[in-house]
Each structure stands twice: as C-alpha cells, then as structure tokens.
C-alpha cells in the first residue's frame, strides 16, 4: 500500500461563490433594523455563506461578533472579511471570521490568455435544492427555475421559463452582467454580489412581461424588454 493510500483526506484548490455584504454603516442597531425591514417575513437565505465587505466603512468601529449573530438569524453565515482590516486579527478570530485579503486588481496579461467565455445551456427544469453554475461564461436555462433552486453565472443569465428561485449573474464581479427572464417570480436577484429580494408583487408595468435585470448605481433595477 502506498503512503498516499494511508491519508484520510486530500487537499485541493477550490473556488467558492460567496455573497458579498458591503456595509454602508458601522452601527449594529441600524444594520439590524435594515435586516428586519428587508427580511421581515421569510428570509430567502438558508445557511448561505457570505463575506463581509468593509471597504466603505471604518472597520475599527464594527461589532464583528454582533454582525455574525444578526446575519445568521436570517440564514446568512459570514465566513470572512475583505479587505482585511489591519490590527483587528484578534477581533476577527473572536468572531470566527477569516481575513480574506484585499481587492487586488486582475492581471490584464493573464486575461488576454484566457479563453473566450462559453455559454452553458440547460434544457431541463432546475428543481428545488439544485444549483447550476456557468463558470467563466453565460447561462441559458430553457425551462423553469423552481423556488429553492439557484442559478449562477460569471456572465449573463437567460431564463426562458419562470424564475422562482435565485439568480446570481456576474458572480466574479462583472458589473455589466444582466439577467433576462420571461416570467419573474424570483426569491432573490444578484449582480456582482449586489442583491435584491422580491418581497412584493411587481408593478403593473412589469408584471407578466419579459424583464431584464441590471445594475445601476449599486442598485438592482428591472426593466421590461421591448415588445
């Protein structure tokens, strides 16, 4: 028997898709109030991992343990902080958070060598509990995405059936990514880590119409597609 056969586990590299929670306030009470207002009913999240983006606030003023507890109440499990705040390693350890480094720029020379994005086509329904990820390209779903299902793409997402679950476009930060949907009944929409839940019925001008979802000024907006 070889030495490797005696090992009880292997270590391999992996890429994980995480929501990014970009804080705009350091006041735990205000953040808690916003969570309550946005998710006063059932949260669309269930044990969903996310990272905390503290680039827009003073990280010294944050109650990290409190943030972990508050977001966990709504199914969002914070696993790390980015960019890593200097001198706060002890506070992160105490809250069970990992330092995830900074926002390093992409190496353009490497991008030139990367293959052109591919399109993943799914011709069957995506059912509750299933996740489909189009890594490095666009995703086309020719059927329905059920409630409790999740579709993710580094590029655009096109859904020719009903979207009743979650759709996350621009998963690697592509802010010009879009989501195109024939029938919008989504639990959650996300582009480049910025997300929005649909807690109310769509306006009459958008209901029962094919829609596109895009990012404008750090906000998710929906527009009807031309007839």
From Swiss-Prot:
Keywords: Cell cycle, Cell division, Septation. InterPro entries: CAP/MinC_C (IPR016098), MinC (IPR013033), MinC_C_sf (IPR036145), MinC_N (IPR007874), Septum_form_inhib_MinC_C (IPR005526). Disulfide bonds: none annotated. GO terms for biological process: cell morphogenesis; division septum assembly; regulation of cell division; regulation of cell septum assembly. It comes from the Bacteria. Pfam families: MinC_C, MinC_N. The keyword Cell cycle applies. Interacts with MinD and FtsZ. Cell division inhibitor that blocks the formation of polar Z ring septums. Rapidly oscillates between the poles of the cell to destabilize FtsZ filaments that have formed before they mature into polar Z rings. Prevents FtsZ polymerization. Belongs to the MinC family. This is Probable septum site-determining protein MinC.
């Amino acid at each position: 028997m070889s030495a490797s056969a005696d090992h009880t586990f292997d270590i391999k590299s992996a890429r994980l898709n995480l929501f990014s929670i970009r804080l705009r306030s350091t006041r735990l009470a205000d953040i808690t109030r916003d969570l309550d207002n946005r998710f006063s009913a059932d949260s669309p999240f269930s044990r969903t991992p996310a990272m905390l983006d503290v680039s827009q606030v003073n990280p010294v003023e944050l109650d990290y343990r409190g943030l972990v507890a508050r977001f966990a109440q709504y199914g969002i499990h914070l696993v790390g902080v980015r960019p890593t705040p200097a001198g706060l390693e002890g506070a992160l350890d105490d809250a069970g958070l990992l330092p995830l480094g900074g926002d390093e720029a992409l190496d353009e020379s490497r991008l030139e060598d990367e293959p052109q994005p591919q399109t993943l086509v799914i011709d069957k329904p995506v059912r509750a509990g299933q996740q489909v990820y189009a890594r490095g390209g666009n995703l086309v779903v020719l059927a329905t995405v059920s409630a409790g299902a999740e579709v993710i793409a580094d590029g655009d997402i096109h859904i020719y059936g009903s979207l009743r679950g979650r759709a996350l476009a621009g998963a690697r930060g592509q802010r010009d990514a879009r989501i195109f949907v024939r029938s919008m009944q989504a639990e959650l929409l996300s582009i480049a880590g910025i997300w929005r839940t649909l807690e109310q019925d769509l306006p009459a001008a958008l209901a029962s119409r094919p829609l596109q979802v895009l990012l404008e000024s750090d906000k998710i907006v929906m527009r009807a597609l031309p007839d």
